[in-house]
Amino acid sequence: MEMRAGMLESRGNRVKWVYSSGGDEMELGKRYDQWAGLYDEDINEHFGYTLPEKVSEIVANWLPGKAVKLLDAGAGTGLVGQSLSALGFTDLVAIDLSEGMLEEARNKGVYRETLKMILGKPLFFEAEFFDGVVCVGTFTLGHAPAESLDEFIRITKPGGYIFFTIRPGVYENAGFKEKQAALEASKQWEQVLI
């Protein structure tokens, strides 16, 4: 489905259009490819999106030695990587399902590597590869499933951290609450901050 001309004129319509992909990964990726060039302007200027900066500050507080390897999962155009880089983090890897979004991320010049991968599927990293995983704005309706957390745990070193944002409604209704409880019960991870 192509973005119609009217969609290009309204930021709100672009967001609705992307979110209406019906959970189809291929369609979602195509829609993000088409939105990539306008994404930063839409999100920052129209919606006042500040989560990348806020989460990056939290990451810096929990991982104060900047010589750590971080995965930006669902990196999009690289807003989180840009914020982490501004705080001194240099070993950053980005993954996203949209090549168009990854191209925008590459243009920011803050990632060591950018790779096309789909959250919820096996990730092409060795076990215990990263000191931390950061996932901002990706756990939302029709995007990455709760099962993504299993791979985050697998690729994070023991004692590492997984930082993610999620809206309460998605947490309650899309399997994340149950997944988190199961991971805590099986001692695979421990929640340290809300």
Task: Describe each PLM feature range.
Residues 135-138:
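A short beta-strand submotif of the Rossmann-like class I SAM-dependent methyltransferase core
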Residues 1-26:
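N-terminal auxiliary segments of SAM/dcSAM-dependent transferases
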Residues 146-158:
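A short glycine-rich, Lys/Arg-flanked "PGG" loop and its adjoining helix->strand segment in the class I
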Residues 159-167:
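Conserved beta-strand signature within the Rossmann-like core of class I S-adenosyl-L-methionine
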Residues 174-194:
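Conserved Class I S-adenosyl-L-methionine
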Residues 48-68:
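Conserved alpha-helix/loop element of class I SAM-dependent methyltransferases that forms part
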Residues 71-122:
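Class I SAM-dependent methyltransferase SAM/SAH-binding core
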Residues 122-133:
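A short acidic, Gly/Pro-enriched loop at the edge of an enzyme's catalytic core
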